[in-house]
Swiss-Prot record:
Protein name as annotated: UvrABC system protein B
Family: Belongs to the UvrB family.
Underlying gene: uvrB
Domain notes: The beta-hairpin motif is involved in DNA binding.
PROSITE patterns to which the protein is assigned, alphabetical: HELICASE_ATP_BIND_1, HELICASE_CTER, UVR
InterPro entries: Helicase/UvrB_N, Helicase_ATP-bd, Helicase_C-like, P-loop_NTPase, UVR_dom, UVR_dom_sf, UvrB, UvrB_inter
UniProt entry tagged with the keyword Transport: no
Location(s), subcellular: Cytoplasm
Segments forming domain Helicase C-terminal: 429-595
Record domain UVR: where: 622-657
Length: 662
């Protein structure tokens, strides 16, 4: 078995060795809940990597969105080049769930655009768990959604060995059963092709490599892995496992049993609807379900097959769905990154799903078994866990209450101190703010200003602009792409002051920021809680000359705790710097990635000017739609999700305009 081995030119320093030892020891002792409290810039990901190396357990790292998951995945791949580091997020570029709005009698059909590359990565993740133990999967909260039965997935796997007696047609039949399609012309992921005694299989978990099985009569003569593009042999294999092309693949025997149970549930539900004088709903349910059953009998699956997952798995009513967590062995390790944000997300998922399903079941669009195609409840999520490490700069009450061991990581290897916090009275705050802004701009740095209300943010932005300060306002209506462009422009010095209400969201770790000001800091509430204040102060923790000004007439408990905690961290870092002769230096952070995203924002202007685009296509709306669809697929393939999503919206607008004209 391959062992986890961290490859890095750095060694753990500062608080890292102590944190690694403490958490690793807790894992060895069997502690279920532990917390790693790590300040911004202290190297939490490197600490996590070293804990994984010591624990030697299959590991799931849970992040609260796709972007953070991708960043973590890239970092772990650098630390573990010889181990399996996989990425598991929702494969939808666009997803409109099935719904029914009773007030307007509107049925909204499920509409989705699946990203083929992410689907491949999901298959790569699950197959890795069956093939090896040295696996790290970085996932978003989509890992708590139903995925199909892991036992069935494993049972349907086709195992091929050199010298094995196996009839070629029998293998082809099994490939079709696990939802591979024969395609001798367009050989792509999830397909196979046949030419004489040669069978080529393109695994669902691959994008460029396929398997060639050569037969001599009824015996497997040779197995090779080859490059799909060039046809060149990469390596000769003694054995290969072909995993199903769908996580919802089901054996014929189980499918027949499931269909029988679906028919019984349908009969029972139709009787119930008729008894309530819901004749239309009963007829609708019968027609839709019978169509699904017919599809399952003919091709082994149907659109929306996940709504029958409980019946296909043979689970009892109300039991939790099988998820990615069930694909892991029992002794797996879970890291929950930014746990103060991720855990509330996990808690909220199931309630939202149920409210949407209520109307679908009530009005005869779905059988009641659809309720069990859902995310896990928080209690079910807890029950599936083995050992958990919460990772956060500001862990919430849940993490601290449940954790039996807490390790703290305050020291930054760069020597950077937490910023100095100055409290000033509200009277004259705007004049004082203006003076502080001018002083900071003269030094060549940037400023973040947080307000409590939208009106104050707008008024302050207008005032600063009138005073000749280059200022922008970051509000909730600004989408991700434009937001990234604003941050990019701030870093470049296109403007100097960024005003906002909630500046805690990702993407605001800006080394050029040397001043963070918090207006109305003494107004207790969500945006001025201890957690929010510590996170806001952290925005200034990337610059050696940074400081934070809090404007307030009284020092609230949240302010007091924030100041006390920041001063404690500053003292620890200063003592460490003095002992090791470290001079704090501002983090030099490459802005290349932000520029790339900003380029996408520039491209949007072209798509937004549809009248000009139509003129260039002689008002041929179909040709323009075709062009944009091609660009959307290309963008999705290149993992440019923001660009692909915007193109999708443009295409919908064009299609609506076309229908209106007709």
């Amino acid at each position: 078995m391959n062992q986890f081995k961290v490859i890095s030119k750095f060694n753990p320093t500062g608080d890292q060795p102590k944190a690694i030892k403490s958490i690793a020891k807790g894992i060895e002792k069997g502690e279920k809940f532990q917390t790693l409290i790590g300040v911004t810039g202290s190297g939490k990901t490197f600490t996590m990597a070293n804990i994984i190396e010591k624990a030697q357990k299959p590991t799931l790292v849970l992040a609260h969105n796709k972007t953070l998951a991708a960043q973590l995945c890239s970092e772990f791949r650098e630390f573990f080049p010889n181990n399996a580091v996989e990425y598991f997020v929702s494969y939808y570029d666009y997803y409109q769930p099935e719904a029914y709005v009773a007030q307007s009698d509107t049925y909204i059909e499920k509409d989705a655009s699946i990203n083929d590359e992410i689907d491949k990565l999901r298959h790569s993740a699950t197959s890795a768990l069956f093939e090896r133990k040295d696996v790290i999967i970085v996932a978003s909260v989509s890992c708590i959604y139903g995925l199909g039965n892991p036992e069935e997935y494993k049972k349907l796997t086709i195992s091929l060995r050199e010298g094995m007696e196996k009839d070629r047609d029998e293998i082809i039949k099994k490939l079709v059963e696990i939802q591979y399609e024969r395609n001798d012309i367009d050989f792509s992921r999830g397909t196979f092709r046949v030419k004489g005694d040669v069978l080529d299989i393109f695994p669902a978990s691959s994008s460029s490599k396929a398997i060639r099985v050569e037969f001599f009569g009824d015996e497997i003569d040779r197995i090779k892995e080859f490059d799909v593009l060039t046809g060149e042999t990469i390596t000769k294999l003694k054995h290969i496992s072909i995993f199903p092309a769908s996580h919802f693949a089901t054996s014929k025997d189980r499918l027949e049993i499931a269909i029988k149970n679906i028919e019984e549930e349908l009969e029972e539900r139709v009787k119930e609807l008729v008894s309530q004088d819901k004749i239309l709903e009963a007829q609708r349910l019968k027609q839709r379900t019978n169509f699904d059953i017919e599809m399952m009998r003919e091709v082994g699956y149907c659109t929306g097959i996940e709504n029958y997952s409980r019946v296909l798995d043979g689970r009892a009513k109300g039991t939790p769905p099988q998820t990615l967590l069930d694909y892991f062995p029992q002794d797996f390790l879970l890291f929950i990154d930014e746990s103060h944000v991720t855990l509330p997300q996990v808690k909220a998922m199931q309630a939202g799903d149920k409210s949407r399903k209520d109307s679908l079941v009530e009005y005869g669009f779905r059988l009641p078994c659809a309720y069990d195609n859902r995310p896990l409840t928080f209690k079910e999520f807890e029950n599936k866990l083995n050992q958990i490490v919460f990772v956060s700069a500001t862990p919430a009450k849940y993490e601290l209450e449940y954790s039996t061991n807490t390790a703290e990581q305050v020291i930054r290897p760069t020597g950077l101190l937490d910023p100095e916090i100055i409290v000033k009275p509200v009277k004259g705050q705007i004049d004082d703010l203006y003076t502080s802004i001018q002083e900071t701009i003269k030094k060549g740095f940037r400023i973040l200003v947080t307000t409590l209300t939208k009106k104050m943010a707008e008024d302050l932005t207008d005032y600063l602009k009138e005073m000749g300060v280059k200022t922008r306002y970051l509000h909730s209506d600004i989408d991700t792409i434009e937001r990234m462009k604003i941050i990019h422009d701030l870093r470049k010095g296109e403007f100097h002051v960024l005003v906002g209400i909630n500046l805690l969201r990702e993407g605001l770790d800006i080394p050029e920021v040397a001043l963070v000001t918090i207006l109305d800091a003494d107004k207790e509430g969500f945006l001025r809680s201890e957690t929010s204040l510590i996170q806001t102060v952290g925005r200034a923790a990337r610059n050696s000359e940074s400081k934070v000004i809090m404007y307030g007439d009284v020092i609230t408990k949240s302010m007091e705790k924030t100041i006390k905690e920041t001063n404690r961290r500053r003292k620890i870092q200063m003592e460490y710097n003095e002992k090791h002769g470290i001079v704090p230096k501002t983090i030099i952070k490459d802005i290349r990635e932000v520029i790339q995203i900003s380029d996408i924002a520039e491209e949007r202007k072209e798509y937004d000017n549809l009248n000009e685009a139509l003129k260039s296509y002689n008002n041929d709306i179909d040709k323009l739609i075709e062009k944009y669809e091609e660009e959307m697929r290309e963008a999705a393939q290149n993992l440019q999700f923001e660009k692909a999503a915007h193109l999708r919206d443009v295409i919908y607008k064009l299609k609506r305009d076309k229908e209106t004209e007709l």
